[in-house]
Amino acid sequence: MRQSQLFTKTFKQAPKDEVAKNAELLIRAGFVHKEMAGVYTFLPLGLRVLNKIIGIIREEMNAVGGQEVLLSALQEKSLWEKTDRWDDTKVDIWFKTMLKNGTELGLGSTHEEPMTRLLSQHINSYRDLPVLAYQFQMKFRNETRAKSGIMRVREFIMKDLYSCARSEEEHARFYAGLRAAYIRIFERVGLGEVRSYRLRHL
C-alpha cells in the first residue's frame, strides 16, 4: 500500500495525557492510537512492524524446534486456585469476569498454569520429550499505574515459551539454543549487539 493511501495521519503533537516518550513518538508518527491509559490500537504502519517482528521471532523459534500453539485468553478460576494465584491479595493484576451461569473467569495475564495442564495431558512418557511449545497471545494486566507508554500496558501481545526436557543437561542445551536464538532476533530486528545483564551472566 502506498503511503498516500493510508487513512491514518501524522500529528504535530501527541495527546496531552500521554507522558511516555515512546508512545508519544509512535502516536505522532501514526503507528499507534491511544484508546486510554495503558491501552493502544496498532494502526496499519504499527501493525506491519509488529507482524514483521513476530515473523522473525517465529522463524527463530521454529528453527530451534519450537511448536507454536495459541491458548485461550479466558482462564478458569479453579485452575488458578490450585496454585494459589487467583486471590487478589496474592496476585492483584487480574481482570475478572463471569459467565451468565455464574462461573468466574479471568483474562490471562500469563499462561503457566494453562500450559502446564495442556502439556500434562499430552506428555505420557519420556519418549514424548523433549517439547518446546510457544505462543503469541494477548495478555491482560490490571496495572494500577500504566504511564510507561507501550512498555507497561494493560493489554499487550506476549510471546511465551515453555520447555519440558528429559534431563537437566537437555534443558541446559535448550537454554543455550534459545539464548543464541534471541541474540539473532535482536540483531535481525536492528537492535544490534544487545546484551542484557541477565544474558551476560547466565
Which sequence ranges carry the predicted segments?
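TRNA-recognition modules of translation machinery and tRNA-sensing kinases, especially anticodon-binding
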Residues: 1-202
